[in-house]
Amino acid sequence: MKKIEAIIRPFKLNEVKLALVKGGIGGMTVVKVSGFGRQKGQTERYKGSEYSIDIIDKIKIEIIVSDDKVNSITEIIIKTAKTGEIGDGKIFISDVEQVIRIRTNDLNSAAL
């Protein structure tokens, strides 16, 4: 199993979510995050002074999938989240050793 973490633009969340549901995911976790990277922040003016805001709000989506679904799910995210501009985000893929559904004690794929 793999954990897919995607950092995307907030306005892309609904489009990405709908495409992922169509693609067969059973659920996902969504977290509001902030950070910086190559995307430059914005310059604001306050009381005559300019200052730079370089921490940008983003959305992080976390999905656990079987190994055979990793490519199709990442392609869906790329296709729907991409604008072609700096700041579109990143996808991180890592191994998941075990998943346990708390309510039923189901393990791994049965817990997804």
Swiss-Prot record:
P-II indirectly controls the transcription of the glutamine synthetase gene (glnA). P-II prevents NR-II-catalyzed conversion of NR-I to NR-I-phosphate, the transcriptional activator of glnA. When P-II is uridylylated to P-II-UMP, these events are reversed. When the ratio of Gln to 2-ketoglutarate decreases, P-II is uridylylated to P-II-UMP, which causes the deadenylation of glutamine synthetase, so activating the enzyme. GO terms for cellular component: chloroplast; cytosol. The modification O-UMP-tyrosine is found at residue 51. Belongs to the P(II) protein family. The gene is glnB. The keyword Coiled coil does not apply. This is Nitrogen regulatory protein P-II. Keywords: Chloroplast, Nucleotide-binding, Phosphoprotein, Plastid, Transcription, Transcription regulation. The keyword Metal-binding does not apply. It is found in: Plastid, Chloroplast. GO terms for molecular function: ATP binding; enzyme regulator activity. It holds the Pfam family P-II. Homotrimer. One of its GO terms (biological process) is regulation of nitrogen utilization.
